[in-house]
Amino acid sequence: MNTKIALVSLAVLSTVSLSAAHTVYGLTTRDQLIRFDSSSPTMVMQANFVWGLAANESLVGIDFRPSNNMLYGVGSFGNIYTLNTTNAMATKVATIMDSVTNMPINLWGAEFGVDFNPVPDRLRITSNLGQNLRVNVATGSTVQDGMLNQGSGAPHIVGSAYTNNTFPGTTTQLFNLDSASNMLTLQNPPNAGTQVNVGPLGMDITALAGFDIVTRNSMNEAFAAIQLNGMTGSKFARINLGTGAATLVGDISMAMSSDSLAVRDIAINPVPEPTTMLALGAGLAAISRRRRKS
């Protein structure tokens, strides 16, 4: 009987694990904060315009900070904001300032990678023009690291994401999307900006891309919002961190609409969805009942 219970327990938990999905927040080119399930990007459940930014400022990227699980946004004028995931209200917390001169730093480029390094709790900002910054979001103090580089060529980095993004972190790696070579790259060492090719995405993407990695149970899953050349909207894809291969999940679009949204960046909520937790609770309750009956 104990063996039977163990098998049932494994089956229930396996079902919960396989059905688990992630809550994804996206930043559109119209400064909308959208929300959808990683398994069904065609069913965007929420779309609110971001408000509370400085006049004429727009957001260039977003990410969840592992140390407090809050969503942060980087403004085009170099301001750092926290974002309310329910109503998209932006609250300014800092401005990017050079750690040596204490002068404001201008962002260079049209597309940016924005992601928290979970080990030192610093925000990495990369750009398609090679900018490479480390930001203390509590103070705005920023280190201008080495320009992004790759041998004799210039990479075109449009999305960045760290692995093992739980707090406190001990080890991590920084992966990037390069829209010029259509490659997944590893930035190693990160502060030097050196790009090492991991492998081809297998798709021809534009510079409009968002990238994020979520870590649960010590497992890293990578996702991206990518715009294919010749298309207007964005598609949601899984990224294989071992090979670089992108696998399309679907268009990112509102429910009951065939029009895809143009998405600049994505950030995956590190906290499991309530539905997933309810499913897990139901599974454990079922196991408990079976044990009592036995």
Explain the meaning of each model-derived region.
Residues 23-27, 70-73, 122-125, 169, ...:
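Conserved beta-propeller blade signature
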Residues 38-41, 84-87, 137-140, 189-191, ...:
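Short loop/turn segments that connect beta-strands within beta-propeller blades
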Residues 2-19:
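Gram-negative bacterial Sec-dependent N-terminal signal peptides
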Residues 272-289:
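A short, hydrophobic C-terminal helix/tail in secreted or cell-surface proteins
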Residues 21-60, 65-68, 242-248, 253-254, ...:
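N-terminal segment immediately downstream of the Sec signal-peptide cleavage site
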Residues 32-35, 79-82, 131-135, 181-188, ...:
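Structural motif
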Residues 60-67, 104-120, 156-170, 207-218, ...:
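Structural signature of eukaryotic scaffold interfaces centered on beta-propeller domains
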Residues 44-54, 91-99, 142-151, 188-204, ...:
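Beta-propeller fold detector
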